[in-house]
Amino acid sequence: TVLSEAMKFWKRIDGYGKILPTILTVTKGFTMKEYFNIGTIPYKGIDSNDPFSFRHYNPDEVIAGKRMRDHLRFSLTYWHTLCADGTDMFGVGTMDKRFDGNDPMEIARHRVYACFELMNKLGIDYFCFHDKDIAPEGNSLFEFQKNLDEIVPLIKEQMQKHHKKLLWGTANLFGNPRYVHGAGTSCNADVYAYAAAQIKKAIDITIGLGGEGYV
């Protein structure tokens, strides 16, 4: 395939060229605990030439009475990091973010594990999401909320296991064609009600996961 040929090309390049094939290496099955074939990214200081290291960001260094990680609350964005497939306006997806899942719910579960693994390796304490980032919409509001109810406990379990926090949650009120005229501004009462139900569910999930804000 074109992607496999591109991977072979990147593997022949030294330095930063090694990053792409490394990041795209994923493992199969839920019994495998590692999705990204990289180690934890350490702080090595300004003189480091290691592309897999921090040169300026030292998370536990205290500045003005607070650790860097408390001043700079970096957050993993679920949609860009775990869902976006690299599509641009004139092309198709170039990144496979299914993590070897075979159906939408299996993919959603894989993404949860991949999320917390990557947060650990990058030293990120927070994450954030839209509702449809973490679970598939399905064919109805009932199915969407059922899918969320299955995935959210897994997220909570992983948060507790890895000591991570939710910075904020929100509802995606733009990705589905039903929102062609907006959500709260829609001229269709059914669309308005659907949006309200999405928001209510997303707020409940955010509160349940101890989110620090709702967007």
Predicted features along the sequence, with ranges:
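Short, positively charged and aromatic/hydrophobic N-terminal segments
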Residues: 8-11, 18-28
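N-terminal pre-domain/capping segments
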Residues: 27-213
